[in-house]
Amino acid sequence: MEITFDGGKIISAHVDGHVIMTDQPVDNGGKGSAPAPFDLYLAAIGTC
């Protein structure tokens, strides 16, 4: 796994050929271009 900081508040996790992006909502200084990290965390727990 590799984690990259892609500018602004966008962070990507590169896992086994997949890219999982996160961003903050607009009202929290992000662009809202991807799920917020905590939302993605909850989705990961829910899909275990």
Report residues per predicted region:
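Extended beta-strand/beta-hairpin segments
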Residues: M1-A43
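Short, thiol/selenol-centered motifs that function as redox-active sites or metal-ligating centers
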Residues: A44-C48
